[in-house]
């Protein structure tokens, strides 16, 4: 086959006999007119590119890999530049600076051994020196070295950047058909490139990426893509945004905490496990008490012996005293007709019921009823004592006698009390034994349920029979536990004091005698006044 001129017959299209088309007759085929009338062919002459032209000129084919039609003359900003370079390499100006810095790089001399490579030579003295050599086609190696730096096409603004990738290889062959005078000219292509558009966002170099990874702070996956958005956010308003909301009933959450509130919750946890420990035998209540005791001992063990029972008793006394103080505060509010004592009630439970916070009218009614009951009790007691002029002992067992605590001692000679030998053990100062019938005792307990504990009596059975002989109307009352004006004035001279602290000072006397509850209120009204929610001594 001649490389200069080669005739190739190509079947272009078979003519349909039904269609009316002009007949084309070749000058050399006049004798075979009958055969050519059935089938018609078009001859195209293909001429191969001469060898001399192939040595001087090489033809490369490029293709833009995109869904859209790419026209560099329209979409690219001129001038368009196409060159071979590393896509990750910096620009020319940065490259010159890096070259200058690389020439003056500091080398750690301490890492270089003084004897050079003598140690390695000593180790490899008896090792056979071998080298593996692989023969590679020089043309293929040259092609590989050239393609290490791909073609990069970019416009003037740098918005359109396309990176080439060679397709095919040594085994592929592509040709181009170019129009010529007599037909087509066949030109073989040396390489076929596919151009892919590079991402618009910035990427980090190897050194920069390694520096980012060495930091302990977490790095998001697409932080380079979001860098521009963060810059825009920083440019905007950096003031924090606050939101307000309305609350239906805003009350302080803080309040007095009960003792043992920090302990663990008491609950029973059961697991349906076949491998669990066997169930403890014995009474369940005893086992539960034992567990509670062990739990308390474990909690108190952390105090290292600092726990004191007296401290717990003092806290309980303060807690009881606070109830008395609340009553006193209500009276003082009624006296001053203002809310000067609201701050002293900060320790109240915000979730307390309305029954605990009674109104002022209820407090006054309660005190009036208390005074009436005391008067009735005194009158009935004096009447019963006057009727019994002669001793009338009753049979009873020693266990039926129970002591009754009184706030005053009987010192009148007109009163005679029969005391049996078994009762001498409980006849102490501050105690008397009254001999009353069971009917009177039951009637007294039913009519005055609150006065019995107020007078200091203990629990007694209905069958107890106590007899009082003589007249008890002239029995003097012990006023040693009453609070006096001098004591209150002495406490106020030390300085301004709150209601709670003042009640705490007279705590023992208020418990000893119930008359101090109303007495201290009258004394405070007389000798004290309020200033900045504190009690101050009046100027006489």
UniProtKB/Swiss-Prot annotation:
Repressor keyword on record: no
GO molecular function: DNA binding; protein phosphatase activator activity; RNA polymerase II general transcription initiation factor activity; TFIIF-class transcription factor complex binding
GO biological process: positive regulation of transcription elongation by RNA polymerase II; transcription initiation at RNA polymerase II promoter
Region listing for Disordered, in residue ranges: 1-39, 70-106, 341-416
One GO location term (cellular component): transcription factor TFIIF complex
Modified residues (Phosphoserine): 259, 261, 399
This protein's record includes keyword Nucleus: yes
Pfam families with a match to the protein in the record: TFIIF_alpha
InterPro entries xref list: TFIIF-alpha (IPR008851), TFIIF_interaction (IPR011039)
Subcellular location: Nucleus
Regions of compositional bias (Acidic residues) in chain numbering: 359-369
Keywords assigned: Coiled coil, DNA-binding, Nucleus, Phosphoprotein, Transcription, Transcription regulation
Composition bias, Basic and acidic residues: 1-26
Biased composition (Polar residues): 29-39, 89-106, 381-416
Stretches of the chain forming a coiled coil according to its record: 280-382
Subunit-level organization: Component of the fcp1/TFIIF/polII complex via interaction of tfg3 with both tfg1/TFIIF-alpha and tfg2/TFIIF-beta subunits.
Role played: TFIIF is a general transcription initiation factor that binds to RNA polymerase II and helps to recruit it to the initiation complex in collaboration with TFIIB. It promotes transcription elongation.
PANTHER family: GENERAL TRANSCRIPTION FACTOR IIF SUBUNIT 1 (PTHR13011:SF0), TFIIF-ALPHA (PTHR13011)
Similarity comment: Belongs to the TFIIF alpha subunit family.
Name of the protein in its database record: Transcription initiation factor IIF subunit alpha
Organism annotation: Schizosaccharomyces pombe (strain 972 / ATCC 24843) (Fission yeast)
